[in-house]
Amino acid sequence: MKWLSLTLLLLVIPPVLNAAGWPEMSWTKDVGARRRPAASTVFLVNDYGAVADGRTSGTAAIQKAIDACAGKGGGIVSFLPGKYLSGSLFLKEGVHFQIPEGVVLLGSTQLSDYPDIPTRVAGVEMMWPAALINVLGTENVSVGGKGIVHGQGKVFWDAYWALRKEYEPRGLRWIVDYDSKRPRTLLVAESTDITVSDLTFQQSGFWTIHILYSQYCTVDNVVIQNNIDGHGPSTDGIDIDSSSKILVQNSDIDCNDDNICLKAGRDADGLRVNRPTEYVVIRNCISRAGAGLLTCGSETSGGIRYVLAEGLRAKGTSVGVRLKSAMNRGGITEHIYIRDVDMENVRIVLEATMNWNPAYSYSKLPGEFNGRLLPDHWNKMLQVVDSVRGTPFFRNVWLSDVKIRNSAEFMRVSGNKTSYMEQFSFRNIDAQVQKAGSVNYARNWEFTNVTIKADDLKELRLQHAENLQKK
């Protein structure tokens, strides 16, 4: 079967199509923050004792300004120009936390300045350091300005790599990411009507912006630059985690892991929580270095559904669209609609797998720990998930109006004999790649006006592929 330049017959028809041939998506009009703090009284952190020298801890002074602002019914917390060193800050209802141009908020390099809080990290609920900026259990908060938030994360990167070097030979790759505590830069959790806009984030110690168990949130016009002074592990750009009605737009992300990532818990703990990520719009964003322009997973346990991503650009990102899970995650990822995408210098345009990073995904206790008292998060990770609950599903994924240049591989898709990759639709795609790639365990796919120009002139390799028709 030649797949280098082809047009395939439409095979899967969704229940409702609009005039343009796309599924009805009225839900896209009901995403993002619906309101922002309106009060205009300004509370300068400098009036509460913050010093703009980049060395003196301003945590207490900045928090005093935040508390005073909230106590007066809301307003603007702002800074005079300069550099401010801080540990964890906790925003409150009605506060606009403004970091103006000429201001740099520096994250402390001391882990003790980030108190442990109950949260979820990489799909598991556990105690973990609070972020530098926290929006927890509240509503109507905004974080913005033209300034810079610099996580000073390299010290935490180095600590992670040192621990991983120690853990991997002992069969502990599966737990090192959880034992190596690192602060996120901005955490929004259990909150509603939150806006993050116009800021530049640099050198995050861990995930940069994490939206967890929240709804009606907007991330707009942010720049993320985590490729500074080293290779930062798990320095994701924007993570949307078991949250709904989220809008991400006009952002530029350069990081060392997933650029924009949708998550919903992992393994036994994620299946217990069982909260989906749903109704997400992502538009007009650029991804530079990173692991995925748009990633779903690998934490899929609660399900990921109803996602529209459009107007995206990938410039050197490792993978364009990445769907990843493991055979102990479970969950259904479906109704993922991606259109108007340009990709250049990506390694793989579409990667989909149900067996992602086995050393990380499957937990096994080494014999040296038998009979020992284990940390709670170890016990959660070691809970066995049966094959029925643990099998993930990917279906109803649409990719349309995509241009690919100077890239290595068009697709690398691998389902499972118990869970085929189902009902994928590809339309109006022009790809110049080194090779077409491979598809295993796929069913009911449709390709319309798809051109793949592969340098090696070899066809797309198909195994266990059903109902892929062409004309």
Where are these regions (language model features)?
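Extracellular "leader-to-stem" segments immediately downstream of a signal peptide or signal-anchor
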Residues: 2-96, 100-193, 197, 206, ...
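Short glycine/acidic-rich loop motifs that flank beta-strands on beta-rich extracellular proteins
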Residues: 74, 87-88, 108-110, 129-130, ...
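Conserved short loop/turn motifs at secondary-structure junctions
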Residues: 79-86, 237-239, 326-327
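Active-site-proximal loop/turn and secondary-structure-junction residues that shape catalytic pockets
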Residues: 83, 213-215, 264-266, 298-300, ...
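Right-handed parallel beta-helix
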Residues: 101-102, 139-148, 192-202, 215-228, ...
